[in-house]
């Protein structure tokens, strides 16, 4: 980080990160533009044991992120798409939260909570997800005594972000178009 930014208050740096992410969304290329910058395989990864979904099922994914995530094939396609955009951290966080809720042992739950926090929530985390300060603060307070619901608010925020941002981009992508053709 440059010395000028280091002198700014922490809240200013957080706000700058939020603005950077929002600007990134606004600066996305139009659908008709040709991707000449970073070539990538536009074919989705196909899960080894998943059956190819029917056209009707694939069309339902447009309407429901839940239906997409419940389908092994849809999940793998969505994950491949997010990887191609270097934005798979939201899905990885959501999955980590789902797995966290299944933990029964308080000791393992505390260990997993710490791991999720360090990987996705804390500032400058390797796969930091974009959540507001309020959500981050509530999540941190919930982790004082970890429970299966410690990450619920953050998970809901990330789910909403995927539903409003990632899902529409996926539906417009070549990944999805290949599935309906």
Swiss-Prot record:
Keywords: Cytoplasm, Membrane, Signal transduction inhibitor. Residues 64-180 form the RGS domain. Its main location: cytoplasm. It is found in: Cytoplasm; Membrane. One of its GO terms (biological process) is negative regulation of vascular associated smooth muscle cell proliferation. Coiled coil: none annotated. Inhibits signal transduction by increasing the GTPase activity of G protein alpha subunits thereby driving them into their inactive GDP-bound form. Binds to G(i)-alpha and G(o)-alpha, but not to G(s)-alpha. This is Regulator of G-protein signaling 5. It comes from Rattus norvegicus. The gene is Rgs5.
């Amino acid at each position: 980080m440059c010395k000028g930014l280091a002198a700014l208050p922490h809240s200013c740096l957080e706000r700058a990160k939020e603005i950077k992410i929002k600007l990134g969304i606004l600066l996305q290329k139009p659908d008709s533009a040709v991707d000449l910058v970073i070539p990538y395989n536009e074919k989705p990864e196909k899960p080894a044991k998943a059956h190819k979904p029917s056209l009707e099922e694939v069309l339902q994914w447009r309407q429901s992120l839940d239906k997409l995530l419940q389908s092994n094939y849809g999940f793998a396609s969505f994950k491949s798409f997010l990887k191609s955009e270097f934005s798979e951290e939201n899905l990885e966080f959501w999955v980590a939260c789902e797995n966290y809720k299944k933990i029964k042992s308080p000791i393992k739950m505390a260990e997993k909570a710490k791991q999720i926090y360090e990987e996705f929530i804390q500032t400058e985390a390797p796969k930091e997800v974009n959540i507001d300060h309020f959500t981050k603060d509530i999540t941190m307070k919930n982790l004082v005594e970890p429970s299966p619901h410690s990450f619920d608010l953050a998970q809901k925020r990330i789910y909403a972000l995927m539903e409003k941002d990632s899902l529409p981009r996926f539906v417009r992508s070549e990944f999805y178009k290949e599935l309906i053709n």
